[in-house]
Amino acid sequence: MKFDLLKKDPQSKARAGTITTDHGVIETPIFMPVGTVASVKGVHQRELKDDINPDIILGNTYHLYLRPQTEILEKAGGLHKFMNWDRNILTDSGGYQVYSLSANRKIKEEGVKFKSHIDGSYHFFTPENVMEIQRTIGADIIMAFDECTPYPCDYNYAKRSMKMTHRWLDRCVNHLDKVPVKYGYDQAFFPIVQGSCYKDLRQQSAEYIANSNQVGNAIGGLSVGEPAEEMYAMTEIVCEILPEDKPRYLMGVGTPINILENIDLGIDMFDCVMPTRNARNGMLFTANGTINIKNKKWEADFSPIDEMGITFVDTEYTKAYLRHLFAANEYLGKQIATIHNLGFYMWLVREARKHILAGDFKPWKEMMVKNMNQRL
């Protein structure tokens, strides 16, 4: 993997760059649609590629390990072939899902014992076997196994957890060297900064991760319920320490406003279920604010979903029609809303990149944040 930093914004820490892997070029800042179980919910791969057009999508190690299971993925020749996707994929390590989905999880130094949310069976994740699982899945960018702490989190617990995440990182790195890639292309490995919302812990963790000297770095444990101001404060601290010549990935973030504010602080990569999940609940993101398409005010609004026309659904269907589909609980409504939201997120990061390259990101960002903060 290669990262080229092309331009720094003169009035902020925002950056524009490119990440190059064996599956192609990723233009940063980038948003990665979440394809949890080898699909971005409600979107065909052809629509995803031709219309939404992301350079990279995300898969979840925890979910793919449980179903379809790594044996099937290996027989298929890896996740790219299994899901017919020839662009980049990033997989998380499963640490967050173990934290968020598993009712009965037991964390110890060796690893995490957890109960499957599918059938109640017990499984054990260690830094070593998670590296092996990610080798078999075959994503272009793979993540270290970490513990994601909740918010709020006791200081002493956050410190112990962070130190264990660092020890797990060392085990990941040591084991990865012993497990060759399986499908003839390279995999980049990113470690993860933790430390909850404690400034000193975030500094310690960022220094440890920077010293690990990997090709890219991630920030985890944010967007777990903390106020946005705390998220931004932690991101700022960490970005001051992480090396400038490597991509920075803020995991699980966020709203369109969160994304712009964190680009301002020096983040290059984002993923979040928000555009897809909120779409299925009738929330549409636009450059002028959010729309709850279920509201009665749209019942006889025959204007296009979004006159900007970022994706084909925006001008082919009206707000009234989309509202009707939600009222009738038709699958098509959720699908249209999902394509719209993902298209908008991709437009947003591409516009951000355009304005960074033009040198006027800061005033554009401030205008966009003000506009997007409205409910329509």
Set out the residue ranges of the language-model regions.
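Glycine- and acidic
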Residues: Y151-Y155, K159, G216-L222, Y331-K334
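Active-site pocket-lining/capping segments in soluble small-molecule metabolic enzymes
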Residues: F82-W85, L90-T91, G95-S102, I107-I118, ...
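Glycine-rich phosphate/ribose-binding loops and adjacent secondary-structure elements
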Residues: H175, V179, Q187-I305
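Non-catalytic, usually N-terminal nucleic-acid engagement modules in DNA/RNA processing proteins
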Residues: M1-K182, K296-E299
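Short, solvent-exposed loop/turn segments at secondary-structure junctions
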Residues: P33, H63-L64, Y96-Q97, T149-P150, ...
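Conserved, mostly hydrophobic/aromatic
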Residues: G24, I57, D92, Q134, ...
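Structural signal for hydrophobic packing residues in well-ordered secondary-structure cores
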Residues: G138, L169, V173-L176, P180, ...
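C-terminal extensions of enzymes
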Residues: M1-T18, I26-M32, K41-G42, D146-C153, ...
